[in-house]
Amino acid sequence: KKIYFYQKDLSLPDALKNFKKVDIVINLASLTDAEGSLKIKNQIYKNNLGIFNNIIKYCKKKSSKLIHISSTSVYGEQKGLVNEECKKLKPKSPYAEIKVKEEKILKKNINKIKFVSYRFGTISGVSKGMRFHTAINKFSLYAALGKPLPIWKSMMNKPRPYLSLRDAFKVFKFTIEHNFFNNETYNILSNNLTLKKIIDYFKKYKKIKIKYEESKLINQYSYKVSKNKFTSKAISLNSNIENDIKSTLKMLGSINNEV
């Protein structure tokens, strides 16, 4: 089949008016830097929430199914193992706040649209359009350039959910092929890892330096995110984050820090 690409500003109300029949919408049109969103709160609210509202309106009008991408960052500060039943979400950034708002909007429209909402962990892995603001990809770039890895010292032993692109693709494929639109929310991650574990992976393949920093987004508690709800109903998610680090460093192996 032919694939067509259209460049559209989805924040405009009529951006989708010429698309007459769309079976499934995958909404990836968001600014995604959680820490960076602190500096552009108004912009990210206007962009991300504006786009989401336009897409919801379109899906309702055209009866299109929606794959909604949320984030595990909606949990904020928690204790122990958290799952989708967690009632007290504590987002720590404008980006995460918007994801909570989007999920609430979906619940209000639960009888008007078919959807599935996925709370993605932090992405890792090689892609043609990859970005480098997420932890593992950023560390890979810095390591390749010989720069010190910017590490939040207070987070060294606190696990966080990470998602390999390989698993993300598997989720999209499964959802479409199995018509997995049951108007529910699922955590999507490959593994929970501490910064210490991630740094150990890097040390296997690269001589690295570390620079300790403080972040504006500091969680006081250590917690893990459960993926059992999705894996028990759908498919296993177990791609190796270490392999993502290895392949990313290999891809970046030819770059240097010369200007």
Where on the chain are the PLM-derived regions?
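Glycine-rich NAD(P)-binding loop of the Rossmann-fold in SDR/ketoreductase-type enzymes
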Residues: K39-N54, L89, S93, E97-I98
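Amphipathic terminal alpha-helices
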Residues: K227-N228, S239-V259
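Glycine-rich Rossmann NAD(P)(H)-binding loop
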Residues: I123-S127, I151-Y162, E184-L193, S215-Q220, ...
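Mid/C-terminal beta-alpha module of Rossmann-like enzyme folds, strongest
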Residues: F139, A143, V171-I218
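Glycine/proline-rich active-site loop of Rossmann-fold NAD(P)-dependent oxidoreductases
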Residues: V100, S124-K138, L165-R166, F174-Y186
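Conserved beta-loop-beta element that borders a ligand/cofactor-binding pocket
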Residues: S71, E103-S127
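Conserved Rossmann-fold NAD(P)-dependent oxidoreductase catalytic core, especially the SDR/UDP-sugar
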Residues: N27, N53-P94
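NAD(P)H-binding glycine-rich loop region in Rossmannoid oxidoreductase-like domains
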Residues: Q7-N47
